[in-house]
């Protein structure tokens, strides 16, 4: 048996260690996971009852059109119901786009480092991947434009970008879209949209009226706290979605996910509270970094990338031994950094305390070695 040649250059996704495994390995009673950009406050209390109401119908297929959720979400965003496509997480919408647009002989343009699933799915489809290094943590849009040619089919903009948390502002995005050829789809991935505080962040939905070659991705996994249920969506012109719908699997979002997302959407107070707490949490980390002279990017997401100036794996291991799970930057293209999900105020205090102790221990060790 022979699998696709391009699969041989890919590795399957490696999830972090489960909390229970970390407890056993390090003999810990409590473990804080701040590695996957999940919502530390969970989801809206409305979700639990919505899921419970679906349990008697688990033998029935879900609504393949997601009509109830579709109507509510379209009204919430202010668009037509036909401008939405749903996926088993926004990851699946990325997969659908790659399946629909990319093949051998085409290419796709993206930043690096960024969300890895753009590259992963493009390679599976046999497309050439053109990666443009970030410029001081931000998308280098001019260089991305220069990488586009007649064979380019999709350009990816992750804003806020994972793992840096930086964003593309309104003026920059408009200028970029004005120069992108009409045959190229521009995908703006807004997985962390609900956390954004920047005043010059673009109203991407309104831009769809002017740029028909644009698609927006959002998710219920982050601020809405439904990561376990896997549901995300794309927003675009009706004719674009009609063209790619055949690449979507039928019944790709479960009835539990649809019901949970519908309920979560009703509770915008919860979302606003989470966004405000996240802002306060980022301020905790900014203050810590400023005190110790650590480099970081101002983040519009629910995470922060901090450069410690030495191996991110070392920081990761130090914290793991103390019951705190973060993401080493070595796996993200930033070998001297770690990415930390913003937790509750108490969780943030715990990790900042641990990081402070780590820096003091390294300083004391350095002083002894140089004495």
UniProtKB/Swiss-Prot annotation:
EC number: 2.6.1.9
InterPro entries, sorted: Aminotrans_II_pyridoxalP_BS, Aminotransferase_I/II_large, HisP_aminotrans, HistidinolP_aminotransfase, PyrdxlP-dep_Trfase, PyrdxlP-dep_Trfase_major, PyrdxlP-dep_Trfase_small
Gene3D superfamilies on file: Aspartate Aminotransferase, domain 1 (3.90.1150.10), Type I PLP-dependent aspartate aminotransferase-like (Major domain) (3.40.640.10)
Keywords carried by this UniProt record: Amino-acid biosynthesis, Aminotransferase, Histidine biosynthesis, Pyridoxal phosphate, Transferase
Superkingdom as given in the UniProt entry: Bacteria
GO molecular function, one term: pyridoxal phosphate binding
Chain positions with N6-(pyridoxal phosphate)lysine modification: 222
Pathway: Amino-acid biosynthesis; L-histidine biosynthesis; L-histidine from 5-phospho-alpha-D-ribose 1-diphosphate: step 7/9
Cofactor section: pyridoxal 5'-phosphate
Top EC group: transferase
Catalytically driven reaction(s): L-histidinol phosphate + 2-oxoglutarate = 3-(imidazol-4-yl)-2-oxopropyl phosphate + L-glutamate
CDD domains found in the cross-reference section: AAT_like
Quaternary data: Homodimer.
Entry similarity comment: Belongs to the class-II pyridoxal-phosphate-dependent aminotransferase family. Histidinol-phosphate aminotransferase subfamily.
Name listed for the protein in its UniProt record: Histidinol-phosphate aminotransferase
């Amino acid at each position: 048996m022979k699998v696709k040649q391009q699969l041989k250059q890919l590795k399957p996704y490696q999830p972090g260690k489960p909390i229970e495994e970390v407890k056993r390995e390090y003999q810990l009673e409590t473990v804080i996971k701040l590695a996957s950009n999940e919502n530390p406050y969970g989801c809206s209390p409305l979700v639990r009852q919505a899921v419970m109401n679906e349990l008697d119908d688990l033998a029935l297929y879900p609504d393949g059109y997601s009509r109830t959720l579709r109507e509510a979400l379209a009204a919430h965003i202010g668009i037509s119901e036909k401008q939405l496509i749903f996926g088993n997480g926004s990851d699946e919408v990325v997969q659908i786009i790659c399946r629909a647009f990319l093949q051998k002989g085409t290419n796709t343009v993206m930043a690096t480092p960024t969300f890895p699933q753009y590259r992963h799915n493009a390679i599976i489809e046999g497309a050439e991947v053109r990666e443009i290094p970030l410029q001081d943590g931000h998308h280098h849009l001019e260089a991305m434009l220069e990488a586009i040619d007649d064979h380019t089919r999709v350009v990816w903009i992750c804003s806020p970008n994972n793992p840096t948390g930086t964003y593309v502002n309104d003026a920059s995005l408009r200028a970029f879209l004005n120069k992108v050829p009409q045959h190229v789809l521009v995908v703006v991935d807004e997985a962390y949209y609900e956390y954004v505080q920047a005043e010059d962040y673009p109203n991407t939905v309104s831009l769809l009226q002017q740029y028909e070659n644009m698609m927006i991705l959002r998710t219920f996994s982050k601020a809405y706290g439904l990561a376990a249920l896997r549901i995300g969506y794309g927003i675009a012109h009706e004719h674009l979605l009609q063209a790619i719908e055949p690449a979507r699997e039928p019944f790709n979002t479960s009835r539990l996910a649809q019901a949970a997302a519908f309920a979560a959407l009703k509770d915008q107070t919860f979302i606003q509270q989470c966004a405000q707490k996240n802002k306060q949490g980022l301020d905790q980390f900014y203050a810590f970094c400023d005190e110790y002279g650590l480099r970081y990017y101002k983040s519009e997401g629910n995470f922060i990338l901090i450069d410690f100036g030495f191996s991110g794996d070392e920081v990761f291991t130090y914290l793991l031994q103390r019951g705190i799970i973060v993401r080493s930057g070595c796996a993200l293209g930033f070998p001297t950094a770690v990415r930390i999900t913003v937790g509750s105020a108490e969780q943030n205090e715990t990790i900042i305390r641990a990081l402070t102790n780590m820096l003091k221990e390294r300083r004391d060790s350095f002083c002894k070695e140089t004495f």
